[in-house]
Amino acid sequence: MRIGLFDSGIGGFTVLKKVIELCPNNSFIYLADTARLPYGVKTNNEIKKIAEEISSWFRYQNIDAFLVACNTTNAIALDVIKNNLDIPVFDLIGSAASNIQESRVGVLATPSTVRTKAYTNAILEFKPKTFVIEQPCPAFVPMIEMDNINSDDITDVATGYLQPLLKQKIHSLILGCSHYPLITSSLRKVLPSSVKLIDPAEALSFKLKFFIDSKTRNYSKNKNFVDLKFYVTSNLKNFSNKAKHWLDVFPEVNLVSLQKKGWVS
């Protein structure tokens, strides 16, 4: 199958890695809208416009399923994407919310995601008595995209973001931005070992696997086969280097303009 997914930058790598682990032997098309990152401080209208452009581009990529690997877009413009695509769309927020077991849940997310209370609303839909507290983290994505991941600086920032959640004695912490699993080690320095970390990509990956298995039961079992194609809207060389580092692949990366109809495909 051909699976499409996108993010503003490298955050979606965390989703891609989880999906490849569970769903090898498929083709993946990854679009990084690097020209407009970070999404987490944009307005709802800006995010909806971006979602319209990205989903329109993917309509021409002959994909069988689409993964919203960006929580901010998921929170604000999931309906835009679903209305623009006539294929199954898998989202991070709904996938994570449906699997929550704990009664006190913290969420780290971008300011735009927190503003929508998308995680709170989704969790309460499945488990109405859950206590949920969301914390905006505007500094994380820029620091991660600049490879400032294992430094004391990001640990200090994480400490400030986590204190309000720890005061509420949370049992689990949702990483509500696909960039955040890249700083798990820094978060663990601050969090008590009793707090469970939840990566929404895990639940999404299982949902995708169930879908693929139900549609394709005779595919190759060679787990070494993965077909990857990458597209970016800017900073091609920088993105390529990051893909080599985080995914251990030497990808062909193409530059694409989402505002023009002369799309690369």
From Swiss-Prot:
GO biological process: cell wall organization; peptidoglycan biosynthetic process; regulation of cell shape
Chain ranges passing through the membrane: none
Source organism per UniProt: Prochlorococcus marinus (strain NATL1A)
Name of the molecule in the record: Glutamate racemase
Disulfide bonds: none
Active site: C70 (proton donor/acceptor), C177 (proton donor/acceptor)
Functional description taken from the UniProt entry: Provides the (R)-glutamate required for cell wall biosynthesis.
UniProt keyword annotations, A-Z: Cell shape, Cell wall biogenesis/degradation, Isomerase, Peptidoglycan synthesis
Family (UniProt): Belongs to the aspartate/glutamate racemases family.
Amino-acid positions noted as binding substrate in the UniProt annotation, renumbered to this chain: D7, S8, Y39, G40, N71, T72
The protein's annotated pathway: Cell wall biogenesis; peptidoglycan biosynthesis
Catalytic activity, reaction form: L-glutamate = D-glutamate
Gene for this chain: murI
Enzyme class, UniProt record, top EC level: isomerase
The protein's Enzyme Commission number: 5.1.1.3
GO-annotated molecular function: glutamate racemase activity
